[in-house]
Amino acid sequence: MSKSPVAIIILDGFGKRAETVGNAVAQANKPNFDRYWANFPHGELKAAGLDVGLPEGQMGNSEVGHTNIGAGRIVYQSLTRIDKAIEEGEFQENKALNNAFTHTKENNSDLHLFGLLSDGGVHSHINHLVALLETAKDKGVKNVYIHAFLDGRDVAPQSSLEYLETLEKAISDLNYGAIATVSGRFYAMDRDKRWERVEKAYKAIVSAEGEKFEDPIELVKASYANDKNDEFVVPAIITKDGKPVATVKDNDAVIFFNFRPDRAIQLSNAFTDKEWDHFDRGANHPKNIKFVTMTLYNPSIDAEVAFEPIEMKNVIGEVLSNEGLSQLRIAETEKYPHVTFFMNGGRNEEFPGENRILINSPKVETYDLKPEMSAYEVTDALVEDIKNDKHDAIILNFANPDMVGHSGMLEPTIKAIEAVDENLGRVVDLILEKGGSAIIFADHGNSETMSTPEGKPHTAHTTVPVPVIVTKKGVTLREGGRLADVAPTMLDLLGVKKPAEMTGESLIQK
């Protein structure tokens, strides 16, 4: 039976910007995109900041974008979720955090706060540490000690002095808390099983092994004098009257305030793993500690979790599956996890009726050397699929504008967009021939801004809106759309009722 498929087509990193200088999207020859823009309802979508569950003004990215697209609702990212919880008072009542506070009161013991000391917002945020100090004081926790991991990667390489000063000001304003140890993230936040690094951080925290300093600021300055920037500061101990300020002991509580899991797992395991064999934890290994992690680092870690993952019900894949509709996810390697795992709300398995095609990305050093990447091969496979009437719904990603855009090179990025346009035409014209329709848009900006105002290469994502085209005659698109509105639009085109969990709205005006 002939199918009239509805497709979501993501031109990854294809933003909308009026200025044409350094704008690969504007400078590319793209007759197909321009033809659809001229002949079909079109507009723009917001794809950054609060509109995708990130802090205001923060650029979007592919993971966040595809999660929002698939969910059909704004999905708050960990940083924003925690910020919101602090603002609205939920943080102060958080069960896991309060369990840590209670543990110290019942055991007449100390609370220790571990985490990356910066406002980089990638692994942690210093504001969350300050909120923990304020909350612990309000809840009557007697002693709190901070084990500060210095950044220098997500922020400037020598910026820790300002963060230490911010922390010391908070401690002084509250007249509460003290810094106990300081360590570069290279040691405390290793993720590559370099256990000798983790061991140094662990032994500083538990056994006060390492160089001793009266003042964290002096410690960092000594490290700089030794050519070691923030990231590489060797774990060291802060002393008062010649004695270590604090170590983690039996019956204490720990809150690890990093929200990104990958670099917090190993140190957490060093404290909680009963079957430990990576290094000798020594006689001081603390027993009966209450260990709390800000988010779920790994289900195998014996810890309470302050902000559990949000389980997403009725993402686009599940809704299509429940309706008995067949669906295809197709992309090349670079964006395959995005059209599958992220689009499915962090789920690896296919839904019933969901099929997947993975086309290998070319094996080149950098994609500016092959700007077309695998766009032709992806399209060949998809055209074959559409001709054979295989699927009711299609989710396709063209990786080129983003992956080549990251090179910061204008000419290859223009070529990348031209290759995508040629293949976009092959796909969309065939869908239209079959009586179907497509939603053509991007997940975030990048290739529309290839140079800085000073004329230097620009390699990052942007906060600009993205274009959207719905290839259906006789409808009008409303303004004010965002990525969360794409899945409801697809359901609208398929004649499927939107589930209550999808708070996004169809872009098609009723």
UniProtKB/Swiss-Prot annotation:
InterPro entries for this protein: Alkaline_phosphatase_core_sf (IPR017850), BPG-indep_PGM_N (IPR011258), Metalloenzyme (IPR006124), PGAM_B_sf (IPR036646), Pgm_bpd_ind (IPR005995)
Per UniProt, where does Mn(2+) 1 bind?
402, 406, 461
Q: Which pathway does UniProt place it in?
A: Carbohydrate degradation; glycolysis; pyruvate from D-glyceraldehyde 3-phosphate: step 3/5
What does the record give under GO molecular function?
Answer: manganese ion binding; phosphoglycerate mutase activity
> What domain of life is recorded for the organism?
Bacteria
Q: One Pfam family this chain carries? A: iPGM_N
Q: Which GO terms describe its cellular component?
A: cytosol
- Amino acids binding Mn(2+) 2: 12, 62, 443-444
Q: Quote the cofactor binding remark.
A: Binds 2 manganese ions per subunit.
Reactions it catalyzes: (2R)-2-phosphoglycerate = (2R)-3-phosphoglycerate
Active-site residues from the entry = 62
Q: Name the Enzyme Commission number(s) assigned to this protein.
A: 5.4.2.12
Question: Per the record's keyword annotation, is Hydrolase included, yes or no?
Answer: no
Gene Ontology terms: biological process: glucose catabolic process; glycolytic process
* Top-level EC class as recorded in UniProt: isomerase
Name the coenzymes or cofactors required: Mn(2+)
| Residues that, per the record, bind substrate | 123, 153-154, 185, 191, 260-263, 335
The UniProt subunit note reads as follows: Monomer.
Annotated function: Catalyzes the interconversion of 2-phosphoglycerate and 3-phosphoglycerate.
Family label? Belongs to the BPG-independent phosphoglycerate mutase family.
The protein here is known as 2,3-bisphosphoglycerate-independent phosphoglycerate mutase
